[in-house]
């Protein structure tokens, strides 16, 4: 899910949607309005799920989408290779999630982990 907001209301550390990917804002630089133009904002972001750095330039008054990012808790049911089967502790739904190299030591069967969910995608936190 996502909601709409203006570029001028965004801040560092928040999230926005760029190229249909939820991204975390690394930095925002705004320029002064010129004689015939509106103020522009240059926004540097990094994808939450793909890790790709992106940069966009848009007018401060333009509209953009902000993803709803939720952190949830789950229990590890099983591990096979680099995939883990998790069960959400509130909804009791089962799903599989890829284990990244930096999280391999933290994931054990029976242990609770936190994960990020946004726009239908999930990632270990």
Swiss-Prot record:
<dbReference type="GO" id="GO:0045905">
    <property type="term" value="P:positive regulation of translational termination"/>
</dbReference>
<dbReference type="InterPro" id="IPR048670">
    <property type="entry name" value="IF5A-like_N"/>
</dbReference>
<comment type="similarity">
    <text>Belongs to the eIF-5A family.</text>
</comment>
<dbReference type="InterPro" id="IPR014722">
    <property type="entry name" value="Rib_uL2_dom2"/>
</dbReference>
<dbReference type="InterPro" id="IPR001884">
    <property type="entry name" value="IF5A-like"/>
</dbReference>
<dbReference type="Pfam" id="PF21485">
    <property type="entry name" value="IF5A-like_N"/>
</dbReference>
<dbReference type="InterPro" id="IPR020189">
    <property type="entry name" value="Transl_elong_IF5A_C"/>
</dbReference>
<dbReference type="GO" id="GO:0005737">
    <property type="term" value="C:cytoplasm"/>
</dbReference>
<dbReference type="InterPro" id="IPR012340">
    <property type="entry name" value="NA-bd_OB-fold"/>
</dbReference>
<keyword id="KW-0396">Initiation factor</keyword>
<dbReference type="Pfam" id="PF01287">
    <property type="entry name" value="eIF-5a"/>
</dbReference>
<dbReference type="GO" id="GO:0003743">
    <property type="term" value="F:translation initiation factor activity"/>
</dbReference>
<feature type="modified residue" description="Hypusine">
    <location>
        <position position="35"/>
    </location>
</feature>
<keyword id="KW-0963">Cytoplasm</keyword>
<protein>
    <recommendedName>
        <fullName>Translation initiation factor 5A</fullName>
    </recommendedName>
</protein>
<dbReference type="GO" id="GO:0003723">
    <property type="term" value="F:RNA binding"/>
</dbReference>
<comment type="function">
    <text>Functions by promoting the formation of the first peptide bond.</text>
</comment>
<dbReference type="GO" id="GO:0003746">
    <property type="term" value="F:translation elongation factor activity"/>
</dbReference>
<dbReference type="InterPro" id="IPR008991">
    <property type="entry name" value="Translation_prot_SH3-like_sf"/>
</dbReference>
<dbReference type="InterPro" id="IPR019769">
    <property type="entry name" value="Trans_elong_IF5A_hypusine_site"/>
</dbReference>
<dbReference type="GO" id="GO:0043022">
    <property type="term" value="F:ribosome binding"/>
</dbReference>
<dbReference type="GO" id="GO:0045901">
    <property type="term" value="P:positive regulation of translational elongation"/>
</dbReference>
<keyword id="KW-0385">Hypusine</keyword>
<keyword id="KW-0648">Protein biosynthesis</keyword>
<dbReference type="InterPro" id="IPR022847">
    <property type="entry name" value="Transl_elong_IF5A_arc"/>
</dbReference>
């Amino acid at each position: 899910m996502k909601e709409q907001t203006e570029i001028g209301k965004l801040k560092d550390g928040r999230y926005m949607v760029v190229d249909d990917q939820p991204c975390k804002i690394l930095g925002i630089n705004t320029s002064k309005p010129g004689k015939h133009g509106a103020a522009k904002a240059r926004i540097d972001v990094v994808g939450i799920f793909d890790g790709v750095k992106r940069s966009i330039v848009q007018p401060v008054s333009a509209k953009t989408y902000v993803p709803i990012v939720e952190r949830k808790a789950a229990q590890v049911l099983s591990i096979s290779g680099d995939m883990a089967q998790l069960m959400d502790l509130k909804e009791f739904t089962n799903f599989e999630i890829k284990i990244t190299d930096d999280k391999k030591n933290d994931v054990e069967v029976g242990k609770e982990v936190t994960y990020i969910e946004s726009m239908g995608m999930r990632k270990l936190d």
